[in-house]
Amino acid sequence: MLARSLLPALALLLAATAGGDACADRGHPSAERSTPETERRRMVEEQLAARGIRDRRVLEAMGKVPRERFVPEQWRSLAYLDEPLPIGRGQTISQPYVVAFMAQALALRGGERVLEVGSGSGYAAAVLAHLAGAVYGIELEPELHARSVETLAELGYGNVHLRRGDGFLGWPERAPFRAIVVSCAMEEIPAPLWEQLVQGGRIVYPKGPEGEVQLLVVVTKTARGPREEHLAPVRFVPMRRGG
């Protein structure tokens, strides 16, 4: 059911994750982009709702999070284009469409405990904070971790908890989780992450090797074992192990 509902957007998702230029909104005069709020509203309407994001709660969450606060100052004027933007240490903040697409795939209803692996700038964690009860994020890069902690604190996200560490290991002290989202590519689910997922829970991640087109998949933990659904072709950087 979930995969079928997302089919109209699949062709757009690969283009977005591969570079985003083809999906950027450049059709409005600069005079209309007067405030981040108006740009955010247009992003939700034209980049998300018009392209297949149907979960009302996801659309509302995307409309509340100030993406410009999660990117370096020199990129803030581009914050609401549907493109990845550099955040330092060779990493990027994902396009709004990709963040919304993955959040929708988690099928959150409110109150859940969610783990994000590769929390980066903290933007996706902020979106998830509007959809779940508590969000736990793991980031390997010390600089990105420190900056995201500061940004989320300034914005008042008290239900987001971040740590620096190896995403392969998850966060056993805060497990179990109803949902896990991984923002970097893996060829298989690490055993610790699977063990930290509750029965009936979902993990969304890009499946495949580095340098190739990967598949965004959602895997549900059932009594009979994992049930995997293929959602869309994507390109993500690979997950790295901690030193």
Swiss-Prot record:
Q: Which UniProt keywords apply?
A: Cytoplasm, Methyltransferase, S-adenosyl-L-methionine, Transferase
InterPro entries associated with the record:
PCMT (IPR000682), SAM-dependent_MTases_sf (IPR029063)
Top-rank lineage group of the source organism? Bacteria
Enzyme class, first EC level, given as a word: transferase
Compartment(s) of residence: Cytoplasm
Q: Where is this region: Disordered?
A: 21-42
Give the UniProt record's GO annotations in the biological process aspect.
Answer: methylation; protein modification process; protein repair
A Pfam family that the UniProt record links to this protein:
PCMT
Q: Name one GO molecular function term.
A: protein-L-isoaspartate (D-aspartate) O-methyltransferase activity
The record's Gene Ontology cellular component field reads: cytoplasm
Quote the function comment for this protein. Answer: Catalyzes the methyl esterification of L-isoaspartyl residues in peptides and proteins that result from spontaneous decomposition of normal L-aspartyl and L-asparaginyl residues. It plays a role in the repair and/or degradation of damaged proteins.
The text of the family note is: Belongs to the methyltransferase superfamily. L-isoaspartyl/D-aspartyl protein methyltransferase family.
What is the recorded name of this protein? Protein-L-isoaspartate O-methyltransferase 2
Q: Which organism is it from?
A: Anaeromyxobacter sp. (strain Fw109-5)
Gene name, per UniProt, is pcm2
